[in-house]
Amino acid sequence: MDNLANQGVIVLAAGGTGGHLFPAEALAHELRARGWDVHLATDARAQRFVGAFAQDHVHVIRSATIAGRNPVALLKTFWSLWQGNLDSRKLFRRLKPKLVVGFGGYPTLPPLYAASNMGIPTLIHEQNAVMGRANKGLAGRVKAIAGGFLPENSGAYAAKTVITGNPVRPPVLVAAATPYTPAGKDDRFRLLVFGGSQGAQFFSQAIPAAVALLPEHERARLLITQQARKEDEASARQAYEKLGVPADVAPFFNDMPARMADAHFVIARSGASTVSEITVIGRPAMLVPFPHALDHDQAANAAALAAAGGAEVVRQADLSPQRLAEMLQSAMNEPERLEQQAKAAKSVGKPDAARLLADLAEAIASGKTVQEFKEGNRP
C-alpha cells in the first residue's frame, strides 16, 4: 500500500450485505492498485465482509431502512438517516474525498446525499437488472450511474448511465482460470448450493428432501457444499448425515469462489453478485429467484443468464422436492449439457468490470462528464 493517497481519497458506500459489499471490494482493489486511498462507509452488519479493508478505513454510518407506514417508525427512520447525514458530513470534511461511490442499500443514502450537497462528485453502481429503491432515490442527484445488468440505452437516466458489468473480487478472477471439467456418469458429482451472503431457508429444507428421493446409487455420487443460515445449519447437516451424503454445511464460506470453481453444478438464488460470479467463473446453474424481492430484481438477473443458455430458472413455487430431484438427477446424468451451459455462462461474464468501473470513477473524480467518458475523453 505504499502508493496510497498519491491520487487522493475515494469513499465507497455500501449496504452491509455481500451483494453490496463484494463489488465494492472489487473496485477498492482496482483503485488501490492505481494509487487511490479507498475508504468504506457502511452499516454495522458489514463486519464479516470487510476483511479487504483496513479497520481504520471502515466507517460505520448511522442509517435505517424505510419500511412500512407507521408514523412513529418512519420518524425514527428519518431521524437515523439525518444522523447518518451528519456522520457523513463530518467524515467527508476530514477525508476530503474526490469521489463518493454508492453500491446500493439504504446505508448509502446518507453518504451520497451528504456528498452531493457538499459538491463532491458522486457515482452509483446498480448491480441488478432492475434499479433498487435506494439507488432510485439517488439517481437524479448523482453525476453518473454504472450498471451491472441494467438495460443499455433505456430509461430516464440513460444519458448518464454506463454499463460496466458487476466487479468481481480477485479470488473470483483466480477461480475463473479453472476450466470446467464435467463429471463422468460414475464420478463423484460436486453440488454447490447457496442463497447469497445471507443464506436461504428454502434450500435448507428443499435440497435434503430432494436428495432423499434420488436412487441410492446416485446419492452415493454426491458431494455437497451448502451455505445455510445459522438457524438452519444443524438440521441441514443432520439430514445429509442420515442420508449418508457427505456435506459441508456452514453459514458462510470465505473461499466461495474456489468452491464454485470446484463444483459441477450450482443451485443458487440470483442476486447480481451471485450471477456475476457464476458467469465469470463459468459454471452451469439452476437459479431460483427470491420470490419476495420487492423489485423482482432477482428474476430479471436470472432471465439475463438464462437467455444466454447458461442457467435454468425455476420459480420457488414450482420447485417441489420431486421436481428438484428430477432436475438434479438430469444434471448428474447429462454432463455434455452441463458443459455447454458452463461455456454459455462464461461467454457472458465480464471479468474486466472492475477495470471499467474504475475508469469511470476516475473520470468522474477528475470532473469529466459521462458523455465525455463515453466519447473516450478520460483522465
Curated annotation (Swiss-Prot):
InterPro entries: GlcNAc_MurG, Glyco_trans_28_C, GlycoTrans_28_N
GO CC entries: plasma membrane
CDD domains named in the record: GT28_MurG (cd03785)
GO biological process: carbohydrate metabolic process; cell division; cell wall organization; lipid glycosylation; peptidoglycan biosynthetic process; regulation of cell shape
EC number(s) per entry: 2.4.1.227
Positions that bind UDP-N-acetyl-alpha-D-glucosamine: 17-19, 128, 169, 197, 298
Pfam families, A to Z: Glyco_tran_28_C, Glyco_transf_28
Record carries keyword Transferase: yes
UniProt GO molecular function: UDP-N-acetyl-D-glucosamine:N-acetylmuramoyl-L-alanyl-D-glutamyl-meso-2,6-diaminopimelyl-D-alanyl-D-alanine-diphosphoundecaprenol 4-beta-N-acetylglucosaminlytransferase activity; undecaprenyldiphospho-muramoylpentapeptide beta-N-acetylglucosaminyltransferase activity
Pathway where this protein functions: Cell wall biogenesis; peptidoglycan biosynthesis
Assigned keywords, A-Z: Cell cycle, Cell division, Cell inner membrane, Cell membrane, Cell shape, Cell wall biogenesis/degradation, Glycosyltransferase, Membrane, Peptidoglycan synthesis, Transferase
Compartments where located: Cell inner membrane
Reactions listed under catalytic activity: di-trans,octa-cis-undecaprenyl diphospho-N-acetyl-alpha-D-muramoyl-L-alanyl-D-glutamyl-meso-2,6-diaminopimeloyl-D-alanyl-D-alanine + UDP-N-acetyl-alpha-D-glucosamine = di-trans,octa-cis-undecaprenyl diphospho-[N-acetyl-alpha-D-glucosaminyl-(1->4)]-N-acetyl-alpha-D-muramoyl-L-alanyl-D-glutamyl-meso-2,6-diaminopimeloyl-D-alanyl-D-alanine + UDP + H(+)
Disulfide-bonded cysteines: none
Topology versus the membrane: Peripheral membrane protein
Source organism superkingdom: Bacteria
Matches recorded under Gene3D superfamilies: Glycogen Phosphorylase B
Family from the record: Belongs to the glycosyltransferase 28 family. MurG subfamily.
Physiological role: Cell wall formation. Catalyzes the transfer of a GlcNAc subunit on undecaprenyl-pyrophosphoryl-MurNAc-pentapeptide (lipid intermediate I) to form undecaprenyl-pyrophosphoryl-MurNAc-(pentapeptide)GlcNAc (lipid intermediate II).
PANTHER family cross-referenced by the UniProt entry: GLYCOSYLTRANSFERASE, UDP-N-ACETYLGLUCOSAMINE--N-ACETYLMURAMYL-(PENTAPEPTIDE) PYROPHOSPHORYL-UNDECAPRENOL N-ACETYLGLUCOSAMINE TRANSFERASE 1
Protein name: UDP-N-acetylglucosamine--N-acetylmuramyl-(pentapeptide) pyrophosphoryl-undecaprenol N-acetylglucosamine transferase
Organism of derivation: Brucella ovis (strain ATCC 25840 / 63/290 / NCTC 10512)
Top-level taxonomy: Bacteria, Pseudomonadati, Pseudomonadota, Alphaproteobacteria, Hyphomicrobiales
